[in-house]
Regions:
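Canonical Radical SAM [4Fe-4S] cluster-binding loop centered on the CxxxCxxC motif
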Residues: 1-5
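Conserved SAM/AdoMet-binding glycine-rich loop
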Residues: 7-149, 154-159
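Auxiliary Fe-S-binding modules of radical SAM enzymes
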Residues: 61, 135-143, 165-217
Length: 217
């Protein structure tokens, strides 16, 4: 969709009385109108179009909350310079308390390979550090402007009990580095063609995350 089309929809929503808007419905805000979306493993972000949408939305004084949805950490990690321009635009325009959801799904390299996941743990760490570098500044409501959210999926092919250990190690590494996360989402995979999960291992992992990572953060 064009920038003009998105801004027209936002304007129409505001005309109808909407004051809080999240720009969603996309898997990665950094690849909006990016270079090589169909051809490159890591498309190169194009800062101008998304900046036009964000600043254009903010021009309407009736708009209260402006948030975004998802980001692909591998795109950020492999394209730091253009990603930084986009991140700065988000910091300038988004309401504080915004979350950029990162879908790692699993820290297990075997699971990553078997399920064609598009981000590995090292790329995730780079992206989380990047968002923390800019997003921890507090806004008008006293909340950090932009923090990463992290998504895990249980039940992907190749998963074992040790996959959860790798997930925990990643989270403990991030905590040791002093990284901030807004929230950690843990869910089970849906659909056919995936393996059964160990309910006890899954529940144990969720409990460890909530008690050892979520609460301290």
């Amino acid at each position: 969709r064009s920038e003009e089309d998105i801004l027209k929809e936002i304007s129409g929503a505001i005309d109808s009385g909407v004051t809080n808007i999240r720009i969603g419905g996309a898997t990665d805000i950094y690849t909006y109108r990016a270079e090589g979306v169909r051809d490159l493993e890591y498309p190169v972000p194009n800062p101008d179009p998304i900046s036009k949408v964000l600043y254009g939305a903010r021009e309407d004084e009736r708009l209260n909350i402006l948030h975004v949805d998802n980001g692909n950490p591998s795109i950020v990690a492999e394209n730091i310079e253009p990603s930084t321009e986009i991140t700065k635009s988000m910091i300038d325009t988004l309401s504080d308390g915004a979350v950029l959801s990162f879908g790692l799904e699993s820290a297990d390299p075997t699971v990553h390979e078997m399920n064609w996941l598009n981000c590995d743990s090292e790329q995730l760490k780079i992206a989380i550090r990047h968002i923390n570098d800019f997003g921890r500044v507090r806004g008008e409501r006293g909340l950090p402007k932009l923090l990463p959210g992290l998504n895990f999926i249980a039940g992907l092919n190749g998963e074992t009990k040790h996959s959860y250990d790798m997930n925990m190690k990643l989270l403990n590494d991030l905590r040791s580095e002093g990284m901030w996360l807004r929230r950690i989402n843990i869910r089970q995979v849906e659909g056919q063609g995936f393996q059964e999960i160990s309910e006890s291992d899954f529940r144990s992992f969720k409990k460890k995350v909530r008690e050892n990572i979520d609460k301290p953060l």
